[in-house]
Amino acid sequence: MIFHQFYSILILCLIFPNQVVQSDKERQDWIPSDYGGYMNPAGRSDEERQDWIPSDYGGHMNPAGRSDEERQDWIPSDYGGHMNPAGRSNEERQDWIPSDYGGYMNPAGRSDEERQDWIPSDYGGHMNPAGRSNEERQDWIPSDYGGYMNPAGRSDEERQDWIPSDYGGHMNPAGRSDEERQDWIPSDYGGYMNPAGRSD
């Protein structure tokens, strides 16, 4: 029974490793990556951080010790493979970038016009449903977590106030000025990207 309780607590700690409220300075070191690990492990310098940013699905965006040229060939895509398979030209790379949820952002051999209609959105459908005009497309781009980035029929000014943030709230709460907006953009994982009153 004691061992059962111990392992239950251990599992909870692994699932919720950073529930304690951190200060702003600590938060910078504790921003979780999308799928485990931290974007800047606490205590690491800026130079080390560049080498330790985990990719979304394993590995690191810049494996430690690699040059900028090598890094370009080693950035893992979100769902397997690499955004630029080593040795491929820029032209080939454009055709080989996997989309987030299957297929390719530009299926090999498709024209730019066709590509615009075939980029899958992150959560189903397409960013520009085939056959829609650019104006209609602007109203139909699904947001990452429900709704639409520009609800159909809203003006550009209204759209700015209605873009949902990735995890609740809005990137620019309606009625706030550009200066206030900078202080109110929610971060992806709680808090705000620029806490109110802080300098740039």
Curated annotation (Swiss-Prot):
Outcome reported for the amino acid change (mutating residue 104 to F): Increased potency on delta-type, mu-type and kappa-type opioid receptors
Main location: secreted
Result when mutating residue 148 to F: Increased potency on delta-type, mu-type and kappa-type opioid receptors
Modified residues (Alanine amide): 42, 108, 152, 196
Subcellular location(s) of the protein: Secreted
Propeptide segment residues: 24-34, 45-100, 111-144, 155-188, 199-200
Outcome of substituting residue 38 to F: Increased potency on delta-type, mu-type and kappa-type opioid receptors
GO molecular function: opioid peptide activity; toxin activity
Keyword Secreted belongs to the record: yes
Keywords, ordered alphabetically: Amidation, G-protein coupled receptor impairing toxin, Secreted, Signal, Toxin
Effect upon mutating residue 192 to F: Increased potency on delta-type, mu-type and kappa-type opioid receptors
Organs and tissues of expression: Venom gland.
Region (Disordered): 30-200
Signal sequence bounds: 1-23
Record's GO cellular component terms: extracellular region
Protein role: Synthetic BmK-YA activates human opioid receptors in vitro, with highest activity on the delta-type/OPRD1 receptor (EC(50)=2.5 uM) and lower activity on mu-type/OPRM1 and kappa-type/OPRK1 receptors (EC(50)=17 uM and 30 uM, respectively).
Protein's recorded name: BmK-YA precursor
Lineage, top ranks: Eukaryota, Metazoa, Ecdysozoa, Arthropoda, Chelicerata
